[in-house]
Regions:
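Active-site signature of cysteine proteases
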Residues: 1-108
C-alpha cells in the first residue's frame, strides 16, 4: 500500500464503518472487529508516524464532508487490521500509454 501511494497517489479501500467510527473527531483511530463487514469506501492518501507513541498510521479521506473527523480526513493505526482497512484495497492503473506520434483531434 505504501509503495502504491508513494508512486501513484491515493488508493481506494473498503472499511467496516461502526457507530464508534462515525463519532471520530481526531487522533489516531484504532478499532478491530472479530467479524468485519466491508460497508464503506474511502481513499487512503498517505501515511505517517506518531513519534511520541511510535505508531504508524494511514491518512485517509472520507466522503462525509469537512465537518467530520479531521476536516474530512482521518488517521488510522497501521498493521493491526483496524476496520479491515488493509484487506480490500484497489488502485486505478491506466491500461494504455499515450502515443505521442498520434495527434488528438477535437471536433466542435
Amino acid at each position: 500500500m505504501k509503495a502504491e501511494i508513494y508512486l501513484n497517489g491515493p488508493i481506494s479501500c473498503g472499511i467496516d464503518v461502526t457507530d464508534k467510527f462515525e463519532e471520530y473527531a481526531g487522533g489516531i483511530y484504532s478499532e478491530k472487529k472479530a467479524f468485519p463487514l466491508i460497508n464503506h469506501e474511502i481513499s487512503v492518501v498517505g501515511y505517517g508516524l506518531d513519534e511520541a507513541t511510535n505508531t504508524e498510521y494511514w491518512i485517509a479521506r472520507n466522503s462525509w464532508g469537512t465537518y467530520w473527523g479531521e476536516r474530512g480526513y482521518f488517521r488510522i493505526q497501521m498493521h493491526t487490521d483496524n476496520l479491515s482497512i488493509e484487506r480490500d484495497c484497489t488502485a486505478g492503473i491506466p491500461s494504455f500509454t499515450p502515443n505521442k506520434a498520434q495527434k488528438t483531434q477535437f471536433y466542435q
